Regions:
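Short, low-complexity disordered leader/linker segments with a strong preference
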Residues: 1-47
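Short helix-loop capping/hinge motifs at secondary-structure junctions, enriched
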Residues: 149-155, 174, 187-195, 272-280
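Sec-exported extracytoplasmic/periplasmic mature domains
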Residues: 67-75, 98-102, 111, 118-122, ...
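Ligand-binding cleft/hinge of the Venus flytrap
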Residues: 67-77, 158-223
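N-terminal segment of the mature folded domain
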Residues: 39-174, 315
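Extracellular/periplasmic juxtamembrane helices and adjacent flexible linkers that interface
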Residues: 3, 273-354
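Extracytoplasmic/secreted proteins, especially bacterial periplasmic and envelope-associated proteins
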Residues: 57-64, 68, 92, 96, ...
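Ligand-binding pocket segment of bilobal, Venus flytrap-like solute-binding proteins
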Residues: 192-257, 265
């Protein structure tokens, strides 16, 4: 299936020619970019290195995706592309890029983090329209991990508010996954007919049960699994699926409805790719994330594919839930301002829960 990125002319400049990138289902991963025709035959572009800055739980997937893209890009264009990657809490990664970490591509836990980089002048407006599904190649949801046998009888969202339950959850100030945890908890009330007041009281009760707030999703998992802290862990569904596939641990987990369908966008960092001359390869890499081979890798590593073809290929792999989106909660801009702005809901809940 071929498509023409609608905003590509904006990224390359008003006078630049539009370039169609085609995806095929199996035989080839990327059709040869038209830009390659401008280079004299037999003279591929010099080798380039791309830096991906992403959130903590994507590493296993990208360890497989990098060589897939590099091999196909080499075959199609003759150019050698290598990768470096930085993994960490999405909020911390966002600040690092704004502060000067020279990412060519970011794949972050939420659109609001990408918007912060845009507001800093590093990403051009309109990035959401660059690729399908608001430039979001994968989804996930929030899982509730319990101890074997579920001794605390955690069978619904409401059970997290029991006073004898000790919860491990990452810090929403540093972790994108933690903000999704918070959104899932809030929406479990409001998307089920409850009021903001009821949601506030519920979340306060939950976070009173949180003893420590690790900086990111991976550290939260280590706290629960390796250090045996807590009765319950709130984390990505991705973490459970990946860990089981790799045989690292088999902690039981539950998925409750309604739940939030998390959306993790990817895009190029315009100022950096233009300065470094890596735009062509960086944009192709982001588009590659939406191809069937990349979607299959994401699914194998616990991410819910975002594309129709990816979803069809992964049918039966993921539990069906009643989902709501951050859009149902007002969108990230409004939700962040209300909940994570200075003096917002989270600051008040944190102060009262300590």
């Amino acid at each position: 299936v071929a498509y023409l990125p609608s905003a590509l002319s904006r990224r390359l400049g008003a006078g630049a020619a539009l370039v169609a990138i085609g995806f095929s289902g199996s035989a080839g991963l990327l059709a040869p970019p038209a830009l390659a025709q401008a280079r004299k035959p037999g003279t591929p572009a010099p080798p380039q290195e791309l830096l991906l800055v992403t959130y903590a739980v994507t590493k296993a997937a990208y360890d497989e995706i990098f060589p897939l893209f590099a091999a196909d890009w080499k075959k199609r264009t003759g150019q050698t592309v290598t990768f470096k990657a930085s993994y960490g809490g999405s909020g911390s990664q966002t600040r690092a890029v704004i502060d000067g970490l020279e990412a060519d591509v970011v794949h972050l836990a939420m659109a609001s983090d990408v918007n912060r980089i845009e507001k800093a002048g590093l990403i051009n407006p309109g990035w959401q329209r660059e690729n399908p599904h608001n430039s979001t190649p994968v989804n996930s949801t929030v899982a509730v991990f319990v101890r074997p046998g579920n001794p605390k009888k955690i069978n619904s969202w409401a059970d997290l508010n029991n006073k004898d339950v000790e919860i491990v959850a990452a810090n929403p100030k540093t972790s994108g996954g933690a903000r999704w945890n918070y959104a899932a908890l809030w929406g479990s009330v409001t998307e089920n007919g409850g009021t903001d007041s009821a949601a506030r009281a519920f979340i306060l009760g939950v976070y009173k049960n949180v003893d420590v707030l690790p900086k990111d999703a991976r550290e939260a998992t280590d706290t629960f699994v390796k250090r045996k802290k807590g009765d319950v862990l709130l984390n990505w569904e991705t973490e459970a699926i990946l860990a089981r596939r790799k045989g690292e641990w088999t902690v039981p987990y539950k998925l409750f409805s309604p739940n939030v369908l998390t959306e993790q966008p990817a895009t190029v960092v315009d100022r950096n790719v233009d300065r470094k001359g890596t735009r062509r390869a960086a944009e192709a890499f982001v588009r590659f994330l939406f191809t069937p081979p990349a979607q299959a890798v994401f699914a194998k590593n616990g991410f819910r594919p975002a594309t129709p073809a990816g979803k069809a290929a992964a049918r039966g792999r993921f539990q069906q839930l009643k989902f709501f989106t951050i859009g149902d909660l007002g969108g990230w801009d409004a939700f962040d301002k209300k909940h994570f702005g200075k003096g917002g809901e989270w600051d008040q809940i944190f102060r009262r829960s300590r």
